[in-house]
Amino acid sequence: MSKVCLLTGKKPKYGNSVSHANNHTRTRFEPNLHTKKIWIEEEKQFVKVKLSAKAMKIIAKTGTAELAKLLK
């Protein structure tokens, strides 16, 4: 699946867009994904991953150790 966050597992959700006249139209809500090159210290290399904005905050707080576990 191409639009899935590697760390958090966020993926598209489905729902309704609701107009002012209360008309409902089915729509797909995409996660806030960004392609990033991240340095993995354990492997001594850059890795290209798709991450959500929340995942980038998690990595900023905890480091890349969690991400390295997922890549193995």
UniProtKB/Swiss-Prot annotation:
The keyword ATP-binding does not apply. GO terms for biological process: translation. InterPro entries: Bacterial_rp_bL28 (IPR050096), Ribosomal_bL28 (IPR026569), Ribosomal_bL28/bL31-like_sf (IPR034704), Ribosomal_bL28_bact-type (IPR001383), Ribosomal_bL28_sf (IPR037147). The keyword Ribonucleoprotein applies. One of its GO terms (cellular component) is ribosome. Disulfide bonds: none annotated. GO terms for molecular function: structural constituent of ribosome. Belongs to the bacterial ribosomal protein bL28 family. This is Large ribosomal subunit protein bL28. The gene is rpmB.
